[in-house]
Regions:
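Short, intrinsically disordered, charge-balanced linker/junction segments flanking boundaries
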Residues: 178-190
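Short acidic-glycine loop/turn motifs at beta-strand connectors
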Residues: 28, 96-97
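A short acidic (Asp/Glu
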Residues: 11-12, 85, 183-184
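Short, surface-exposed coil-to-beta transition loops
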Residues: 20, 85-87
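Extended amphipathic, helix-rich lipid-handling scaffolds
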Residues: 1-11, 22-30, 34-82, 105-179
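Secretory-pathway-linked proteins and extracytosolic
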Residues: 101-103
Length: 190
């Protein structure tokens, strides 16, 4: 069925969102979700340091149950706000037999269409808070004109200090960049 301005509160470690508009169809075996939303607020305290305001969200996704497990496939999602525009696709799978209560296995890839370099840290997960905090202080200016990112592996091991456990990659072309590696050093301009 169709829904408008739907809100889901965060609970039990799961994220929440408000302002969702789209359609949903499915049953206990699986289903499909389509979003065409404006003015979405995404809350995931366990993942991001603050709620993310999304001006435009368009997505197609599907899910299916296999025994005790769940798989969610994002066919395509496009998110945009004043700070960035990204596209993402990929799969998340629960790991119900994991001995460590893993948050799941993921294989996501995305493209950064545009982003304000000073805002990039706002979109990085809590698992790399130290890197995110450094970027907050070090990135002084710039526009990301083209970028890509990948996240693949068992999220229990994130941020993947052992490369055999997973991959997290962010690459970008930055125009008008200004970076201050260390407070005692002069800033570098590009």
């Amino acid at each position: 069925g169709r829904f408008e301005e739907l809100g889901v509160s965060p609970a039990g470690g799961l994220p929440g969102a408000s302002g969702l508009t789209g359609s949903l169809e499915g049953d206990e075996r699986g289903g499909k979700l389509r979003l065409e939303s404006r003015g979405v607020l995404f809350e995931a305290a366990g993942i991001f340091r603050a709620p993310l305001a999304i001006e435009s969200l368009e997505a197609r996704a599907a899910w299916k149950r296999e025994g005790p497990g769940l798989e969610v496939r994002i066919e395509e999602a496009r998110l945009a706000n004043a700070g960035a525009e990204v596209t993402v696709s990929g799969t998340w799978r629960s790991l119900p037999d994991s001995p460590v209560n893993s948050p799941g296995w993921v294989d996501l890839a995305g493209r950064v269409v545009r982003a304000k370099a000073v805002a990039v840290a706002d979109y990085l997960p809590n698992g790399i808070a130290q890197t995110r905090d450094w970027l907050d202080k070090a990135v002084l200016a710039g526009e990301v004109s083209d970028g890509r990112f990948e996240l693949k592996g068992d999220l229990w091991h994130f941020p993947f200090r052992d490369a055999s456990k997973g991959r997290f990659l962010v690459e970008a072309a930055i125009d008008g960049g200004r970076l201050q590696y260390h407070p005692a050093w002069p800033a570098v301009d590009r």
